[in-house]
Every structure is written in structure tokens, then in C-alpha cells.
A protein has these predicted regions:
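Cofactor-/ligand-binding subdomain signature composed of acidic, glycine-rich
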Residues: 1-43, 47
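Gly-rich Lys/Arg/Thr-decorated short loops/hinges at beta-loop-alpha junctions or inter-strand turns
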Residues: 11, 32-40, 100-111, 224, ...
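A short, well-structured juxtamembrane/interface segment
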Residues: 46-61
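Active-site pocket-shaping loop/turn-to-helix segments
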Residues: 49, 111-112, 201, 233-235
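A generic structural signal for well-ordered alpha-helical segments
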Residues: 61-62, 157
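Glycine-rich phosphate-binding loops that contact phosphosugars or nucleotide phosphates
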Residues: 69-208, 213-220
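Short, amphipathic alpha-helical interaction segments embedded in low-complexity terminal/linker regions
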Residues: 216-308
Length: 308
């Protein structure tokens, strides 16, 4: 029997540690998957400098009123949409600031759209539709690094002057590397189920995206210490969190924090500055605007210590 050469894409190779997983019990399957997943964080850590570079590019884009776009297909596209959709409630950002684009459009979020990922022209067109330009950052997401839709988007984004990056889980071709300013390549190895990149590759990708958006948002002043001071209180849980943050930072009872938040238009940052500087809402908003929205430049006190 002729022996086939291994697929150059590590994400498509068979995992020798799970070759007989179909004979495993439920607990054995869980243990095998858990053992594989423990390697993911280490793979991501090898890319710390590249991830930090993209954080800095994104910070610069945000400071120039630019945007961050994630572009992917299938699981990769969905992960981009997931990360983008969490930014407004977490950091009080406008929905346009971080956007996730998936090959096949909205229907592809719930159901695979056959052939959509195979069109580089489709990726290029979506960059034109969003008028991507020099103030923007475009991050392609492709576990195997071979998605034509992503390649097309990156090429067009670069031609339009945007900064570009790719998140992948297998070594990339020189041609693809030439399309991007930064390549984040978290090699997690073959999947538990061959080619199922929703597993380790998906986990690694989500970790990287978390770092990009969270890092950039922190850098532009969206937190005070590790407190979420720019959140939008869109539900009861977030209203409760807003009250707890104001009460903790200002050292006041919850009912007083609630009243202060109401006077501040439910903006945590504004409420804290109103209390700390003994000013009204307009005065707090003016002070924050002068400080570029960074609360540390207005309130010189360190955040309260973490309760033990």
C-alpha cells in the first residue's frame, strides 16, 4: 500500500493520541479532549509579541477613529462576530468600532453557506462595501490559513491602506505572509477529530481575539484598574455591576451609588468623576473629554485594593 505524505496543513493531520477515540468511554473522551486543550494556552503564548503588535495597531486605529474588522468563514467567522458583539456592552463602544464579517453573510452565522468561503472576490467586495481605509485594521481568521475569502479580504484591505493581520493555527505560505503586517500563528497541533478546527484551533483563536480587543480597549482607557468602567448597563446584571463598581470605587453605600449613577446618565465613569471631583455631570463629562476618556488622568487615586 502506498503511504501518503502528511497534509502540509497541521490542522488537517491525524492526531496519533486520539486515533482510537471511537473505542473510548465517555470519561475517556473527556480526558483525551481535556489533555489536548491544556496545550492550547502554551501555543498561544508563543505568539505573545505578535499579539501585542496587533493590540498596538488596533489601539492606534481606535485613537484615530478607525475600526477593527475580523474576517473569517465558518467557525472562524463566528468567533470574530462573537468577540465583536461583546465589545459594546463590555466597553461601551459603538457597534461600528469592532465588526465581525463572515463569508456568506448573516445566514452563515447559523448555517453553513456552501462555497461562500471559496470566493476571494467576495472577500474583496466586503472590504469595499465597508469602505475600509488607512485608519482601519483588518484581521483575517483562518485556522488552516487557506481560506480564499479571507485572502481576498486581506489583499483588498492592504491595497486600500489598512493595516492587516492574520490569525492561523498552521504555518503559512510566503504568499500569504506577504499580505499582512502581522501573522499570529498558534500551532495547536492536529485536532481530536481530524480537521475539526472548531476544537483546539477555535479555542486558540478565541483566546487571541480576546487579547486583541481587551488589550486595545484597556489601552484607550476603557477600564479603571481592572474595573469595567465604560460598560453599558443594558440588563439587570450590568446595572448591578455598575452600582457595585461605583460603590466600591467611591466607598459609598449601594443606594447612594444608584442615585449617583442616575444623575450621571448611568455612565460609571461619569459617576465616579462626579463623586471624586465634587462636580456635576457636565463638569465630569468635560473633565473626561479633556483626558481622552481615560479616568486615570482625571482621578489620580489608585483604584481600591482587591477585596480578600
Amino acid at each position: 500500500m502506498t503511504r501518503q505524505a502528511p497534509d502540509p496543513r497541521i490542522t488537517e493531520r491525524r492526531n496519533p493520541r486520539t486515533a482510537n477515540i471511537d473505542l473510548a468511554s465517555a470519561i475517556e473522551i473527556v480526558d483525551l479532549m481535556n489533555a489536548e486543550d491544556r496545550t492550547v494556552a502554551d501555543a498561544v503564548a508563543t505568539q505573545r509579541e505578535e499579539i501585542a503588535h496587533v493590540v498596538s495597531l488596533t489601539e492606534d486605529a481606535f485613537r484615530r477613529d478607525g475600526r477593527l474588522f475580523y474576517v473569517g468563514a465558518g467557525t472562524s467567522g463566528r468567533l470574530g462576530i462573537l468577540d465583536a458583539s461583546e465589545c459594546p456592552p463590555t466597553f461601551g463602544s459603538e457597534p461600528e468600532m469592532v465588526q465581525g464579517i463572515i463569508a456568506g453573510g448573516f445566514p452563515a452565522i447559523l448555517r453553513a453557506q456552501e462555497g461562500a468561503e471559496d470566493s476571494p472576490a467576495g472577500g474583496a467586495a466586503v472590504m469595499d462595501e465597508h469602505d475600509v481605509g488607512e485608519r482601519d485594521v483588518v484581521v483575517g481568521i483562518a485556522a488552516s490559513g487557506t481560506t480564499p475569502f479571507v485572502h481576498g479580504a486581506l489583499q483588498r484591505a492592504r491595497a486600500r491602506g489598512a493595516r492587516t493581520a492574520i490569525v492561523a493555527c498552521t504555518p503559512l505560505s510566503e504568499k500569504l505572509l506577504a499580505m499582512v503586517d502581522v501573522a499570529i500563528i498558534a500551532v495547536v497541533g492536529p485536532e481530536v477529530v481530524t480537521g475539526s478546527t472548531r476544537l483546539k484551533a477555535g479555542t486558540a483563536t478565541k483566546m487571541v481575539l480576546n487579547m486583541i480587543t481587551t488589550g486595545a480597549m484597556i489601552r484607550i482607557g476603557k477600564t479603571y484598574g481592572n474595573l469595567m468602567v465604560d460598560l453599558k448597563a443594558t440588563n439587570e446584571k450590568l446595572k448591578d455591576r455598575s452600582e457595585r463598581i461605583v460603590a466600591e470605587v467611591c466607598g459609598i453605600p449601594r443606594d447612594e451609588a444608584r442615585t449617583l449613577l442616575s444623575a450621571a446618565g448611568m455612565r460609571v465613569k461619569t459617576a465616579i468623576v462626579m463623586y471624586k471631583l465634587s462636580v456635576d455631570r457636565a463638569g465630569a463629562e468635560e473633565a473626561l473629554a479633556a483626558a481622552g476618556g481615560t479616568i486615570r488622568r482625571v482621578v489620580t487615586d489608585a483604584p481600591p485594593p482587591v477585596p480578600t
